[in-house]
């Protein structure tokens, strides 16, 4: 699979970085998007959301870094479920997130990213990482992981390795399908 070279958000860039989220296998995905024109970028985000929202997926800019933007694609219903987990709520509550409302948690995450003092490692919860792995990463300062893949694993290695393989296969299959002219919209699975 070849790297995507683009100067604004594109279907290729999203597929390259977000296939597991598009397929409904993952709660959310992050990627850095090169941006030359902020206005065009925001128009493209609005247009993409117009197509994604009916399928239960949303894409939002999290942090503008000048020549690039950190972008978050997620499934709001799945995120609400993930952040409702008691272990996830505990991690977020310890960091003063408004745990009762998912959208306000995203606003708080954006604030922390913009603040820039320390990277908010609880971001893993917004990506669907297991709370025990997010907690382990935070508590151990990223040291002592049992396994490393899409994230550092401190809990169940076997389950994580299966997910890593699933995500990798999904990305490969989505990329191949897109290269064979499969519609971007048809690659976004509507989850109930």
Language-model features, listed with the residues they occupy:
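Internal catalytic-core helix/loop-beta-alpha segment
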Residues: 94-121
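Intrinsic low-complexity, intrinsically disordered or marginally ordered coil/linker segments
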Residues: 1, 20, 93, 106, ...
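Hydrophobic/aromatic-rich, well-ordered segments within soluble, folded domains that form packed cores
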Residues: 119-146
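Long, compositionally biased
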Residues: 150-192
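Short, flexible, solvent-exposed loop/turn segments with mixed acidic/basic and small polar residues
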Residues: 18-24, 59-63, 110-115
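Short, extreme N-terminal leader segments that mark the start of a protein/domain
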Residues: 1-34
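A glycine-rich, hydrophobic loop/mini-helix early in the fold
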Residues: 43-101
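Metallocofactor- and cofactor-centric catalytic cores in central/energy metabolism, strongly enriched
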Residues: 39
């Amino acid at each position: 699979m070849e790297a995507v070279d683009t100067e604004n958000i594109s279907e290729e860039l999203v597929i390259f970085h977000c296939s597991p989220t598009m397929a409904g296998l993952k709660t959310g995905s992050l990627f850095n998007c090169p941006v030359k024109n902020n206005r065009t970028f925001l128009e493209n985000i609005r247009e993409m959301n117009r197509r994604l929202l009916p399928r239960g997926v949303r894409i939002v800019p999290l942090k503008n870094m000048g020549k690039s933007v950190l972008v978050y694609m997620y499934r709001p219903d799945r995120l609400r479920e993930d952040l409702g987990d008691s272990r996830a709520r505990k991690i977020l509550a310890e960091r003063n997130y408004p745990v009762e409302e998912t959208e306000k948690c995203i606003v708080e995450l954006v604030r922390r990213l913009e603040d820039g003092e320390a990277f908010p490692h609880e971001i893993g919860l917004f990506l669907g990482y297991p709370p025990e792995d997010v907690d382990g990463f935070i508590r151990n300062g990223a040291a002592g992981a049992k396994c490393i893949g899409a994230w550092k694993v401190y809990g169940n290695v076997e389950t994580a390795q299966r997910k890593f393989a699933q995500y990798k296969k999904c990305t490969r299959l989505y990329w191949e399908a897109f290269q064979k002219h499969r519609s971007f919209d048809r690659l976004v699975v509507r989850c109930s």
